[in-house]
């Protein structure tokens, strides 16, 4: 039986009594860019947060059903959510490097706090992660500087390096280019093509055009349900549902 990077089974998510994710069944293959697209408020960011148990931090949120990572239900009582978040990293919409830490420390912090490396080994991990995020050549001579003077795109790649340093299996990205200029956006989109060789990328985007450019598979979410899911080219060029066609052509926002 094929093992998927992420599989959901009858996933339902509530904020209080409001059901925002309504019985979603989804299978995300390994080593792809998988886009979740849909209008604002459709539930795509909530769904993304269920994939690494970030919703645990919201006392209003309740999760029912299963989310399986490499075959294991991460909502089982014996699963450590800290370990889940180590294996499933998250990049948020607003670039959020720690302003009080240097560029080096921003990449190293997760590794240090988890006791995974120190000394020269830590130096090598930081260098490797910055190279992997295509940022090393831009910052290698200012690792002791603070990130305030980095561009928005550089800050977001620094955050990606911080995630990579933890050696995750999956990287979740919640509209990672929404607040970045076109040059920075292009660099991050190019980076996704490289990262999917080693990781599974799940990308929330408000832009159908971006989903079409960078993803291998796409799910269109509307009012908490999946309307259509499949290979990106098929969904955009030959959608099965009228709602999907309206969304990808800009008639539904």
Curated annotation (Swiss-Prot):
Q: Which CDD domains match?
A: ABC_PstB_phosphate_transporter (cd03260)
Q: Name one GO cellular component term.
A: plasma membrane
Gene that specifies this protein: pstB
Q: Where in the cell is it found?
A: Cell membrane
Where is this protein chiefly located? membrane
Please provide the record's keywords in A-Z order: ATP-binding, Cell membrane, Membrane, Nucleotide-binding, Phosphate transport, Translocase, Transport
**Example GO biological process:** phosphate ion transmembrane transport
Question: In its keyword annotation, does this UniProt entry include Acyltransferase?
Answer: no
Q: How does it sit in the membrane?
A: Peripheral membrane protein
Entry EC no(s): 7.3.2.1
Role according to the record: Part of the ABC transporter complex PstSACB involved in phosphate import. Responsible for energy coupling to the transport system.
| Lineage of producing organism | Archaea, Methanobacteriati, Methanobacteriota, Thermococci, Thermococcales
* GO terms of molecular function: ATP binding; ATP hydrolysis activity; ATPase-coupled phosphate ion transmembrane transporter activity
Q: Which domain of life is it from?
A: Archaea
Protein's name in the database: Phosphate import ATP-binding protein PstB
């Amino acid at each position: 039986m094929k093992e998927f990077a992420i599989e959901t089974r009858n996933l339902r998510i509530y904020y209080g009594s409001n059901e925002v994710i309504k019985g979603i069944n989804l299978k995300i293959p390994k080593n792809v860019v998988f886009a979740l697209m849909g209008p604002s408020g459709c539930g795509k960011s909530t769904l993304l947060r269920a994939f690494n148990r970030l919703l645990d931090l919201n006392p209003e949120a309740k999760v029912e059903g299963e989310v399986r990572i490499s075959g294991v239900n991460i909502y089982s009582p014996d699963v450590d959510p800290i370990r889940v978040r180590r294996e499933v990293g998250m990049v948020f919409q607003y670039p959020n490097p720690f302003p009080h830490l240097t560029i080096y420390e921003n990449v190293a912090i997760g590794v240090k706090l988890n006791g995974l490396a120190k000394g020269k080994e830590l130096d090598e991990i930081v260098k490797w992660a910055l190279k992997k995020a295509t940022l090393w050549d831009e910052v290698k001579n200012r690792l002791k500087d603070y990130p305030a003077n980095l561009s928005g795109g550089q800050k977001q790649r620094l955050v990606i390096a911080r995630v990579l340093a933890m050696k995750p299996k999956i990287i979740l990205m919640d509209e990672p280019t929404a607040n970045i200029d076109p040059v920075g956006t292009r660099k991050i989109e190019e980076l996704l093509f490289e990262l999917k060789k080693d990781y599974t990328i799940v990308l929330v985007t408000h832009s159908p055009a971006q989903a079409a450019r960078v993803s291998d598979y796409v799910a269109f979410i509307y009012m908490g349900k999946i309307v259509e899911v499949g290979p990106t080219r098929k969904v955009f060029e030959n959608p099965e549902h009228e709602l999907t066609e309206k969304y990808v052509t800009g008639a539904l926002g």
